[in-house]
Amino acid sequence: KLRKKNFKVKKIDGDIFRKKNKTTKFNKKSIIENNLSIINYIDKIHNNYDFVIVSVISPLKKTREYAKKKFGKNYFEVYTKCSIRELTRRDTKKLYEKAKKNIITNLIGFNSSINYEKTKYKKIIVNTDKETISVSSNKVIEKINLWVKVLAGKIKLQFM
């Protein structure tokens, strides 16, 4: 939707980033390293784009707060909720299947000792096994509209 409105958008997939950096573990140290690496990469490129959208599992408050501090009012989180049952059903990478067989350990939300650490920061919550893609994406677009109004002087993006 943003590209259709001629915004320059960069999408970053945390899993692809993880592979490029050859980070294969899901322990706390590796998660922090991967998330900080993504944040530092974004810091180098964000001025070239109107929006940088990152999809990454970021369960640790420390890294999310670091990103918020680094990017300030240009940062907001989308917390995606989904049941393990639904995640397993959708799992195109077969991560949950591998986790069930202990091929992968510490898969966040499944067999991990790492839990999601809550922050006081207000974020968008989308519940992808209870909401349609349209409802979830509209929540994000509404936040972007608000963000644009605050930062750019009452401009409103219209998405249908």
Predicted regions, residues:
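Hydrophobic/aromatic beta-strand patches that form the interior of the parallel beta-sheet core
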Residues: 12, 53, 76-78, 124-126
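Small-molecule kinase domains that catalyze NTP-dependent phosphoryl transfer to phosphate-bearing small molecules
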Residues: 81-84, 89-139, 146-155
